[in-house]
A protein has these predicted regions:
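Rossmann-like NAD(P)(H) cofactor-binding subdomain of soluble oxidoreductases
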Residues: 24, 38-116
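Short phosphate-binding/catalytic loops that engage adenosine nucleotides
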Residues: 14-15, 100, 148, 188
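NAD(P)+-binding Rossmann beta1-loop-alpha1 motif at the extreme N-terminus of oxidoreductases
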Residues: 1-47
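Short, solvent-exposed amphipathic alpha-helical segments in soluble enzyme
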Residues: 10, 69-71, 97, 142-145
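Primarily hydrophobic membrane-targeting regions of prokaryotic envelope proteins
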Residues: 1, 51-54, 165
Length: 215
């Protein structure tokens, strides 16, 4: 999520000087999507940022925020936004208390780690939450810069918002899996002359036929 959002902001004219990436996969994505950025520890990125994007799993967000606040890594006036769907700005309270302007900016889409993420991000809705109209204006501007559509979500409704998206997504995944299985069965058998064989490889014939209908 982080490298995709960073690349989208960079395309909009922001300078992404640094990223924090721990896993080999995330470091590789950062190197490809943000080749001019330095990979640094989170505290160093935070200390030098005017806009700090926290794109970590929901279960790790509170710990990261607490650590950054304890280390005094975020300067007053820094815009800090997280990409979690389940959390509003309450989880960022330790940084708000230190003078940061905090936002929740959640892209409502599934990330695959592939190039298509960037294209889909430009057409995604973003659930945004802020403390006041100034915060909402900044969040909306950031989302629009990335090509997305900002949608306001009240702080007290973030849990319901996330649950609704997860519920819908899980059912859609089940439906798509079932549809792919049925389509593969319908297309299997002796191959027609010149037609690609039907298999379960990613981006196979069944996936390509279903994609325009499911998107």
């Amino acid at each position: 999520v982080g490298s995709a959002v960073g690349a989208a902001l960079e395309r909009a004219g922001h300078i992404v000087f640094g990223v924090s990436a721990i896993s080999e996969a995330s470091r590789r994505r950062a190197g490809v999507r943000l080749p001019d950025s330095h990979i640094l520890p989170a505290e160093q990125v935070a200390a030098r940022s005017e806009l700090l994007i926290l794109a970590v799993p929901d279960t790790e967000l509170a710990g990261l925020v607490t650590g950054l606040a304890a280390a005094h890594a975020v300067r007053p006036g820094t815009i800090v936004a997280h990409t979690s769907g389940a959390n509003g700005i309450g989880v960022l309270a330790p940084l708000t208390e230190r003078g940061a302007l905090t936002l929740a900016i959640h892209p409502a889409m599934t990330f695959t780690g592939h190039d298509e993420d960037l294209a889909r991000l430009a057409n995604a809705c973003f659930g945004i939450t802020a403390a006041d109209e100034i915060g909402y204006a900044i969040a909306q501007s950031l989302v629009i810069e990335m090509g997305g559509e900002p949608v306001r979500v009240a702080e007290e409704h973030r849990t319901l918002y996330h649950a609704a998206l997860a519920h819908g997504s899980n059912h859609l995944v089940t439906l798509v899996v079932d549809a792919l299985a049925a389509l593969r069965a319908a297309l299997s058998g002796p191959g027609l002359l010149g037609q690609q064989l039907v298999d379960d490889e990613p981006n196979g014939l069944a996936e390509r036929m279903l994609a325009p209908l499911a998107s």
